[in-house]
Amino acid sequence: MAGLHRIDRGAEIAFISIASQLARGGDEVTLIGSGPARPGTEYRYIRAASIDRERFERWPSLPLFRNETGWEEASFIPGLLKAYRPSEHDVTMTCAYPWTNWALRRPGAPPHVFVTQNGDWPAYSDEAEFRWFGCDGLICTNPEYFERNRKRYRSALIPNGVDTARFSPGPAERERFGLPAEGRIVLMVSAFIASKNIPEAIRAVALLPDATLVVAGDGPLRNELRELAERVIPGRYRQLTAPAAQMPALYRSADAFLHLSRDESFGNVFVEAMACGTPVVAYDLPRTRWIVGDQGHLADQSAEAVAAALEQAMGEKRAAAGALSERAAKFDWREIARSYRDFLGRVVEQS
């Protein structure tokens, strides 16, 4: 994947976490990404150059190049093809389509597993470039994807996970992030893109006069969202970026965690927030209920309902921390990696 070792978003964190756990268990694991090598990794890492997606934010949307991520992935392929030696591997895995999937499935390649980190439409759509999708195994990150695809592909239902050794309850560290010491903090951890529905979050927080909305992330809508917040919640909005090592402290510094994506394939951020003992507020959707269980504050899709859920969640933070971290423990990466190991082994044996 192009983003490996360069950005720490959901899919990249998932692949690195799985690779680390599998390597720790004795498997030989190779990751190929565009970022620099990191000291102390338990897997083998090969760097293949790409052009950062931010350079493509103003480029046109075309078939095969539907957004800045598609352009970035295409720029990654020459380096990937140079680094990739099919004979050295028993199985390959990606969540990137089309370019990386096609490159890893070239003639003579080992069995290939596709993970629905970014959605399952490559697996079921017969339109445009999706008609050329293929894999020997499909890992579905939620039950909806699994039910839709299990008759067509060898499939497994395996969610994403969380490192419960790092993400755990603890004291707030607001000063570390330049956040106000007084008042309540609503945190979002999100790319600044349309599907994350940050404008809806801004409008909900506007109904909570003493709350500040903090959005950790980046993306093409950063300026547009800042301008909206200045009009709707002046003085009560922060945009920031934080390295992966600081994310547990950031979650602990919030009174509630808010995530309003309607079509996320999983949402690592839900289990990260719960593991830190921070109450979760989200839209009431089957996929969200499957992740948070009875521990989430789920609302219908109106600003008033979201604000009411935030109010309730922030009032229960201390009392709920134990139950939240207990729920998150069900998604520990060690257990998730065992499921990956079992499925990858079956794919190799049956292909």
What are these regions (language model features)?
Residues 10, 318-347:
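A charged, aromatic-enriched C-terminal amphipathic alpha-helix characteristic of glycosyltransferases
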Residues 144, 161:
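Carbohydrate-associated surface elements
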Residues 179-196, 202-205, 214:
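Conserved donor-binding/catalytic core segment of Leloir-type glycosyltransferases
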Residues 226-242:
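Nucleotide-activated donor-binding/catalytic signature segment of Leloir-type glycosyltransferases, i.e.
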Residues 243, 262:
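Aromatic "clamp/platform" in nucleotide-sugar-dependent glycosyltransferases that forms part
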Residues 249-254:
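Short alpha-helical donor nucleotide-sugar binding micro-motif in glycosyltransferases
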Residues 279-282:
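Short hydrophobic beta-strand element within catalytic cores of glycosyltransferases
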Residues 294-304, 311-317:
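Conserved acidic donor-binding segment of nucleotide-sugar-dependent glycosyltransferases
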